[in-house]
Amino acid sequence: MTLLIDLIDETGQVSKEQLEEVEKLLQFAADALEVKDQAEVSVTIVSNEEIHQINKEYRGKDAPTDVISFALEEEGEGEIEIIGADDIPPVLGDIIISVDRTKEQAEEYGHSFMRELGFLTIHGFLHLLGFDHMTEEDEKEMFAKQTKILDDYGLSRSS
């Protein structure tokens, strides 16, 4: 199973090795979650200022956040199903991560920058796959999946 990943660090603050680790983690998660072969995802690393603007424009929240996901394959209510779409690899969507919040939260939670970057990446990826945390039950399921993927990959909270 190959996930096609477009990974961009607009800040220049994430090392080549860390970006490669994000790619490996996403491939690992895609395999674990049985994502369709050749599915596409983009991950963009931005500043607090940039994610603040995106959060304000698209979510109506006038503050920076850690991660935002824009799913492209969600079927909305009343949308017509496209015949043959199951044969085409899906474009899952975009994950946007604040490098500043990643650093802050890693320090706050007492683990590595890479563990926090991995957590935010998987959190955003699960949103692209339709998981959310709007109800307590959904939150438990989503967070259990996140933890399992990160632990199985080797990025546990102690990392």
Swiss-Prot record:
Matching SUPFAM superfamilies: Metalloproteases ('zincins'), catalytic domain
rRNA-binding found in the keyword field: no
Keyword Translocase: no
Enzyme class: hydrolase
Pfam families registered for this protein in UniProt: YbeY (PF02130)
EC numbers for this chain: 3.1.-.-
Chief place of localization: cytoplasm
GO molecular function, one term: zinc ion binding
Cofactor: Zn(2+)
Gene3D superfamilies reported for this sequence: Metalloproteases ('zincins'), catalytic domain
Any single biological process term in GO: rRNA processing
Binding, Zn(2+): 123, 127, 133
GO cellular component assignments: cytoplasm
Keywords, comma-separated and alphabetical: Cytoplasm, Endonuclease, Hydrolase, Metal-binding, Nuclease, Ribosome biogenesis, rRNA processing, Zinc
Cofactor binding note of this UniProt entry: Binds 1 zinc ion.
Family under the similarity heading: Belongs to the endoribonuclease YbeY family.
Chain's role: Single strand-specific metallo-endoribonuclease involved in late-stage 70S ribosome quality control and in maturation of the 3' terminus of the 16S rRNA.
PANTHER family (UniProt xref): ENDORIBONUCLEASE YBEY, CHLOROPLASTIC (PTHR46986:SF1)
Protein name: Endoribonuclease YbeY
Organism: Bacillus pumilus (strain SAFR-032)
